C-alpha cells in the first residue's frame, strides 16, 4: 500500500493571526471560519504559536479576563510543533498522539507556513489508522499509569470535582486539583495499610 504524505491531505487555506491580535479578534476568526484553532505567525509567516478554543476558555474566559485586553502572544501555546509536507501520515499520527495534540502546521524548507493537517483530516482519507491511533493511545496511557504522577502542572477543570484550578496534576489517568489529589493519596495509603 502506497504511503500518503501529510502534504496530500493538508488544508492549504490556513487561518492565521498575529501575536498582537486580541483574544476577541482570534475568537471572531474561529467563529467566522468554523474552525477550532488559529495559527499565530510572525512577519515572515513562520508559525510561532497556536491558539485553540480550549485556550480561550481556560486562559481568558475562566479567569475572568477582558478578551479585548488579552493578546495572542500571552495565551498561545508555544513552541508550536510543525512538520514538513513529505512526512507520512502514520508518522504524523504518532507525533500527535505522543504530544497530545490534534493538529500540525506544515512548513516549507524555510520554516514558512504552507498548510495544516488535523487528526480528522487524516482519518477521513486513512480510516485504517484508527487502529494505529488506538494502539498509540494505549501505549501512551500505559506509560502515564507507570508514573505515580506527571510533574507538569496545568490549569483547567478538575476531572473529579469539576472545579477550576491552576494546579491540576495528571494522576491515574485524570487531571485532578490539589484537594482531589490529597484524597487519592489518602486512599492509596489506606489501601496499602489494608494490604499489610
Swiss-Prot record:
Q: Which UniProt keywords apply?
A: CBS domain, Iron, Metal-binding, Repeat, Zinc
**Binding of Fe cation: at which residues?**
158, 161, 177, 180
Q: Which Gene3D superfamilies match?
A: CBS-domain
Pfam families listed in its UniProt record: CBS
Looking up PROSITE patterns in the UniProt record yields: ACP_MB, CBS
Q: Where is the ACP-type MB domain?
A: 153-187
MF GO annotations: metal ion binding
State if Amino-acid biosynthesis is listed as a keyword.
Answer: no
Q: What InterPro entries does the record tag this protein with?
A: ACP_MB (IPR044065), CBS_dom (IPR000644), CBS_dom_sf (IPR046342), Diverse_CBS-Domain (IPR051257)
Tell me the superkingdom of the source. Answer: Archaea
Instruction: Give the SUPFAM superfamilies listed for this entry.
Output: CBS-domain pair
CBS domain: residues covered:
10-69, 76-132
- Record-listed Zn(2+) binding positions: 158, 161, 177, 180
Query: Does the record bear Transferase in its keywords?
Result: no
| Name of the molecule in the record | Uncharacterized protein MK0525
Source organism (scientific name): Methanopyrus kandleri (strain AV19 / DSM 6324 / JCM 9639 / NBRC 100938)
Highest lineage ranks of the organism? Answer: Archaea, Methanobacteriati, Methanobacteriota, Methanomada group, Methanopyri
